[in-house]
């Protein structure tokens, strides 16, 4: 059987699969062509949310993550999920950066410090990761382990730290390792706006033992609440013993593990520890601020001294060039689908209207801006309306025309198109408009698919996440405007040799399986890092 050409990936953005009902606009729409293909062609559904796309369990999918997974051909884990998965798998406890920090403190007979945002917020850090580090220290028999808790109050309730402290104290008691040495509101310890005077107060508590004083973390938090200060704004506080001496400070020869996985609010404090040119950098910053006529702080903070022989580990890469160990370095999508096609000398065409153009280019290509050799692109402007329920067809007719030109040019081996309508109109919450949006997509495919089949090509039709199939909120009965956790449809339309009598699409797939499926149709071998599996099962 000759290789199909072109192989076309059609992404019906936001068209999920759900039972019929008054809120399922995709089902309510008059879409005879899509309905027929779903019924008569090889069909399956794909996991497009939660763990299937590298998000936390139960989290709705989105277009950025969806297209990243589609193009990568493997599950692209977001940092929270990646670290939590490493804990579950056990890989966390053999992480080279963590083990190097532990070896450092053993060789220097020094202390291990764990610092980061405290609690289950999951935006910048997660308490499970801190608990796992305590477990690691216990397994490795590290005796001196000190905790520096940055209180949240933003990604969680403003005064919730005491509850998280109960949990942490239970872990410490169970493992017999860990002593809380400082607490500080994230306002100080996690500033990202070059307000160095805030960072300086946190650093002074951590390194010099200078700040508010309390006999325990609980006492520090309760004292703040008594002064009507919520978690975020708790002044950097040093925990002291019965003699008024700090329980611990970070010293020369120690090791620090910064538990934040989101980079932006970890950079500044990390620089305070490891940047040899910090004071000059701060001075230049305030000189620029002064030249721009901006107000300066009453006192410009300068680091008294930089710690020596410090082993500093960040959970993820906060910034290129920092002299730190990175526990979970960025995992780049080195050979996305478009790269494999390009390396084979094939031509490809990526098209969408403005709203979804970055998704079929930047995100599908693994975060790469530039096209690969042999990759052509076409951007169709989205209509300029206040909200897309006013024009539910959006630019689908124009996308279809340009797509037909690409197909009939016979230049391309692979084509990808995104129809934005079900998602973008779905966000308006208007069921009549979303019905029209789905009908506009059906009308476009009614013209496109025959042109593909006439040339001996095939079309793989999918969605990247759900939306249009759930327009009524099950809790409130009001409009539902968000994405869903419903699966995405996936069906293959082709000529002889591609019907249900010849092949089927396996169940249990996810978006990461799309690229290997397309490469099988293109008769190309997936690269080693493309761990997704083709959905095609050939009937014997």
From Swiss-Prot:
Transmembrane segments: none
Catalytic center residues: 63 (phosphoserine intermediate)
GO process annotations (BP): glucose catabolic process; glycolytic process
Gene3D superfamilies in the record: Alkaline Phosphatase, subunit A, BPG-independent phosphoglycerate mutase, domain B
Domain of life according to the entry: Bacteria
Lineage, opening ranks: Bacteria, Bacillati, Chloroflexota, Chloroflexia, Chloroflexales
Details of cofactor binding: Binds 2 manganese ions per subunit.
Cofactor(s) required for function per UniProt: Mn(2+)
Residues making up the signal peptide according to the UniProt record: none
Keyword terms: Glycolysis, Isomerase, Manganese, Metal-binding
Cellular component aspect of the GO annotation: cytosol
Family, as annotated: Belongs to the BPG-independent phosphoglycerate mutase family.
Any GO MF annotation of the entry: phosphoglycerate mutase activity
Pfam families: iPGM_N (PF06415), Metalloenzyme (PF01676)
PANTHER family: 2,3-BISPHOSPHOGLYCERATE-INDEPENDENT PHOSPHOGLYCERATE MUTASE
Protein name according to UniProt: 2,3-bisphosphoglycerate-independent phosphoglycerate mutase
Assembly with partners or alone: Monomer.
Enzyme Commission (EC) number: 5.4.2.12
Pathway(s) annotated for this protein in UniProt: Carbohydrate degradation; glycolysis; pyruvate from D-glyceraldehyde 3-phosphate: step 3/5
Sites where the protein binds Mn(2+) 2: 13, 63, 464-465
Entries under NCBIfam families matching the protein: pgm_bpd_ind (TIGR01307)
Residues that hold Mn(2+) 1 according to the record: 423, 427, 483
Catalytic activity, as annotated: (2R)-2-phosphoglycerate = (2R)-3-phosphoglycerate
Primary role: Catalyzes the interconversion of 2-phosphoglycerate and 3-phosphoglycerate.
UniProt: substrate binding residues: 124, 154-155, 186, 192, 262-265, 356
Catalytic class of the enzyme: isomerase
